[in-house]
From Swiss-Prot:
GO biological process: hydrogen peroxide catabolic process; hydrogen peroxide metabolic process; response to hydrogen peroxide
Name used for this protein in its record: Catalase-related peroxidase
One of the record's GO cellular component terms: periplasmic space
Summary of the knockout phenotype: No significant differences in the growth kinetics of cells grown in medium containing high or low concentrations of sulfate.
PROSITE patterns from the UniProt entry: CATALASE_3 (PS51402)
Function as written in the Swiss-Prot or TrEMBL entry: Has an organic peroxide-dependent peroxidase activity.
GO molecular function: catalase activity; heme binding; iron ion binding; peroxidase activity
Cofactors demanded by this protein: heme
Family the entry assigns: Belongs to the catalase family.
Keywords: Heme, Iron, Metal-binding, Oxidoreductase, Periplasm, Peroxidase, Plasmid, Signal, Stress response
Lineage of the organism: Bacteria, Bacillati, Cyanobacteriota, Cyanophyceae, Synechococcales
Active-site residues, Swiss-Prot/TrEMBL: 58
Enzyme Commission number, as recorded: 1.11.1.-
Localization in the cell: Periplasm
Amino acid sequence: MIRIRNRWFRWLAIALASLVASIGIATVGFAATGVTPDQVLSAIEGTFGVNVGQRRNHIKGTCAVGNFVATTEAKTYSRSPLFSGQSIPVVARFSLAGGNPKAPDTAKNPRGLGLQFQLPNNRFLNMALLNTPVFGVASPEGFYENILAIRPDPTTGKPDPEKVKAFREKYPENKAQAAFLASNNPPTSYANTSYFGLHAFKFINQTNQTRLVRWQFVPQDGEKRLTDAELQAAPANFLEQKLIERTQDSPVKWDFWITLGQPGDAEDNPTIAWPSDRQQVKVGTLTLTAASPQPGAACEGINYDPLVLSDGIEPTNDPVLQFRSGVYALSYSKRTRGL
C-alpha cells in the first residue's frame, strides 16, 4: 500500500480522489435531487455522531485481500479489463451498516462489502455491495429522511416511533428490504452470505452491444445464518475474528454472477427486485486469501465509490447510485483531513 506522507501531496490526493469520485471513469453525471451530499453527510453525523478520522457510514469494518479471475464467458458481455481472465488483485472491506463503531455483530442490519479491483495501468474499478437483494429507498431524499427518522430521541435514547412510522408511510418502497432483514437472521460469518450490487449497470462488449445487468457474489462456503438461539448467545464482536480465522484455514471464495435484464426491468430503482426467471451468468470468482483488522490495513484509506468503473461497464441513471459519489467524496475528504 502506498502511504502519502508529504502534506502537500496528501491534499492533492484528497482533491484528486474527490474528483474521481465525482466523475468516476464511466459516469453519466449527478441526477438532480432535492438534497445535497453535505446535507446527507450532516444528517449521518447528527444521527450517529462523529468519529474523528473515520468513515461516517459503515464505520465498523474489516480488511481483506485477494484476487479475481473472470470466466471465458464474461468477455461475451463486457470488454472491461476486469474480465481479461488474468488474476486481478483485490482489496476488500467488510462492514456493518451505520455509523456506530461499537454496533454489535448480531444487529439485524445490512452487512456491506466494498471491492477495489486493481486493474492494469494503475486503473481501478470499485464495487459497493450489501447482503440484502434490494436497497431501502429509491431516492437520495428517502435516504436523507430515513437517517433523520432513526435519530435517537434525546429523552429516550431511541428513535421516535412516530417519526419512523411517518417515514415508512411516506416511502413504502422501504418494505422489501425491511421485510428481508426482519425475516432473515444475520449471517454466521462474512464468508457465509451473498452480496448484491443493488443497482443496475450497463455491460458493453467488443462489438458495442449493451446489456443491462445486476450483479451479486455468491459464497462457495454456502449461505448460513445464525439461529435464534445463536443470535441470543453470540458475542458483540465475532465477525472479524471468524473471517481472519477462515482465511487462515484456506482461501474463501465467492462466484460473481450477473443477471441479464429485459425490457421493463427496473433500471433506476434499487428497491425493486428483478423477476426470478431472468438469465444468470457466472462471470468470475473472487478469492480472498487474508483478512485483518482495519487500522493500518490496505482497505482503510480506500474510498469505495461505486462510480469508479472501467471501459465496458457504465452506470445507469439510478438517482441513488448517481448520488453516492458525492457523499463518498465528502466523507473521504473529511476523514483524511482528520475531521
